[in-house]
Design a protein with these regions (language model features):
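Conserved amphipathic alpha-helical interaction elements at protein-protein interfaces in regulatory
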Residues: 33, 37, 53, 79, ...
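N-terminal helix-turn-helix DNA-binding core of bacterial DNA-binding proteins
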Residues: 18, 25-69, 150
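Short secondary-structure capping/turn micro-motifs that flank functional sites
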Residues: 8-9, 51-52, 96-97
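Charged, amphipathic alpha-helical coiled-coil/dimerization segments
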Residues: 28, 56, 78-136
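Amphipathic alpha-helical linker/stalk segments
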Residues: 123-125, 145-150
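N-terminal leader segment of winged-helix/HTH proteins
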Residues: 1-38, 132-133, 140-145
């Protein structure tokens, strides 16, 4: 047992993994009530963000952009398609590939979604500079996990 003069490297509150998991869980829960009026869950919102950046997209490319397996992405797409926000079709350039594109309703939803980031920051009680610093720190951790082990 460590003394009060030493710092326990195994203390739960010192673990980056614990901070990431608990923060992610809580931040995602803040999105729920903000996204509900749009008819979206947080995972569906992420899909829509990726498609608002670039549509149409091949399923494989969309899954990669979201860091998801295509099998995990497929049920999300099915629900978005049932809601009339996207459509899935065979890629005209490659019959084996599936292309995902926004419908007119999906494009129109973007206008309403523009308010989401501001509402989230308001609910979190932090400003743009803090959010940008946190995002940059998280992206640095993400990049470090993608580098070869030293």
């Amino acid at each position: 047992m460590p003394t009060t003069a030493t710092v326990d490297p195994l203390a739960l509150d010192r673990q980056v993994c614990f901070a990431l998991v608990t923060t992610a869980r809580r931040v995602v829960s803040v999105y729920g009530p903000v996204l509900e009026p749009l008819g979206l869950t947080h995972p569906q919102y992420l899909v829509m963000l990726a498609l608002w950046e670039h549509s149409p997209r091949r399923l494989r490319d969309l899954a990669e952009a979201l860091s998801l397996e295509p099998a995990t992405l497929s049920p999300l797409l099915k629900r978005l398609e049932a809601a009339g926000l996207i459509e899935r079709r065979r890629d005209p350039d490659d019959d084996r590939a599936l292309a995902v594109s926004l419908t007119a309703a999906g494009v129109a939803l973007r206008e309403r979604a523009l308010a989401v980031p501001g509402q989230i920051m308001e609910r979190l009680g932090i400003g743009i500079p803090e959010v940008e610093r946190a995002r940059d720190a998280l992206n640095a951790i993400l990049a470090a996990t993608q580098e070869p082990a030293r």
